[in-house]
Amino acid sequence: MAEHQVNYASGLPVVLTSVDKLVQWGRSNSLWALSYGLACCAIEMMAAGGSRYDFDRFGTIFRASPRHSEVMIIAGTLCKKHAEFTRRLYDQMPDPKWVISMGSCANTGGMFNTYSTVQGVDRIIPVDIYVPGCAPRPESFQFALMILQKKIRKEKASRKIAPKRLI
């Protein structure tokens, strides 16, 4: 049998771990994603949202507003002029929030080693999951969502605090 943490402060036993598991199950199975397609990887992200891969079974719904999203998916090359706008979108998302960096260009700048390209999205905002490839297949993106779901289930139910600005 699994042991549960019991709190007798109110005089009655209260099981706290079950509430944590319930909240994390709900969060992990209803991922509302802000699709932020910047280049070729966005085409694979759109293909992943189609009926062939059926992302609805994971509870993933693509949203257009950052205020209705908890997962930001950055797919493609991020230019330095666009970096502050990306940070503003991230700041508008409610806590807890997670970021998936999709593709070589989003992860490391890809083949564009120029003055105008951000060499990795993690220089602007914190990234939770990296999806490698140029352009990564929808199956890789699907696997990244499953890893994110496992990560969310392991976190505490308390609200995740966003780190300070990186720029």
Curated annotation (Swiss-Prot):
GO terms for molecular function: 4 iron, 4 sulfur cluster binding; iron ion binding; NADH dehydrogenase (ubiquinone) activity; NADH:ubiquinone reductase (non-electrogenic) activity; quinone binding. It is found in: Cell inner membrane. Gene3D superfamilies: 3.40.50.12280. It is a peripheral membrane protein. One of its GO terms (cellular component) is respiratory chain complex I. Keywords: 4Fe-4S, Cell inner membrane, Cell membrane, Iron, Iron-sulfur, Membrane, Metal-binding, NAD, Quinone, Translocase, Transport, Ubiquinone. It catalyses: a quinone + NADH + 5 H(+)(in) = a quinol + NAD(+) + 4 H(+)(out). The keyword Metal-binding applies. Binds 1 [4Fe-4S] cluster. The keyword Nucleotidyltransferase does not apply. Its EC number is 7.1.1.-. Belongs to the complex I 20 kDa subunit family. NDH-1 shuttles electrons from NADH, via FMN and iron-sulfur (Fe-S) centers, to quinones in the respiratory chain. The immediate electron acceptor for the enzyme in this species is believed to be ubiquinone. Couples the redox reaction to proton translocation (for every two electrons transferred, four hydrogen ions are translocated across the cytoplasmic membrane), and thus conserves the redox energy in a proton gradient. NDH-1 is composed of 14 different subunits. Subunits NuoB, C, D, E, F, and G constitute the peripheral sector of the complex. This is NADH-quinone oxidoreductase subunit B. It comes from Campylobacter jejuni subsp. jejuni serotype O:2 (strain ATCC 700819 / NCTC 11168). The lineage of its organism: Bacteria, Pseudomonadati, Campylobacterota, Epsilonproteobacteria, Campylobacterales.
